[in-house]
């Protein structure tokens, strides 16, 4: 059986946690930040967990994560 290919776009965006879930950075926190409140930017800082419905899809895209 051939090696499975990793989806490189997904590999750059998602990391697997120790419990097997995936985490990712939140959107809207890259540019055009001056008009956004400090509270909004602060709340966008922590990594978010991928929903359970999308987990199996990421398992296929990142077979070695």
UniProtKB/Swiss-Prot annotation:
Q: Which InterPro entries match?
A: Ribosomal_bL35, Ribosomal_bL35-like, Ribosomal_bL35_CS, Ribosomal_bL35_sf
Protein name (database record)? Large ribosomal subunit protein bL35
Q: Which GO terms describe its biological process?
A: translation
One CC-aspect GO term = cytosolic large ribosomal subunit
One Pfam family it belongs to: Ribosomal_L35p
Listed PROSITE patterns: RIBOSOMAL_L35
One GO MF annotation is: structural constituent of ribosome
Q: Which family does it belong to?
A: Belongs to the bacterial ribosomal protein bL35 family.
